[in-house]
Amino acid sequence: MGMSDAFPGRERSRHMGELKRGPNRWDVYLEVQPDAELGAVRGRIHFVGTTEATHRATGWVFLEWQERDVLERFGEFSAVELLQFVEAIPG
């Protein structure tokens, strides 16, 4: 199991790419989870750095009807916006 394989929600996550800024590198994962009560799908973003201690995650920032809608919304974020997300998360 590699550094990016172990975090809560990994089994529901898709690897979306990698971010780099200076010496920092983050693997970016999008976790989706059905919400049966609402009949919708929630999504949040995980940023996994070079050690397990550098795992950061957003709250549930997406709420859409289908998983493909969450993926589409995620695709609207630029690399700069994703870096702003990870830098704003306490860690």
What are these regions (language model features)?
Residues 1-8, 52-57, 89-91:
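Generic structural signal for short, solvent-exposed loop/turn connectors between secondary structure elements
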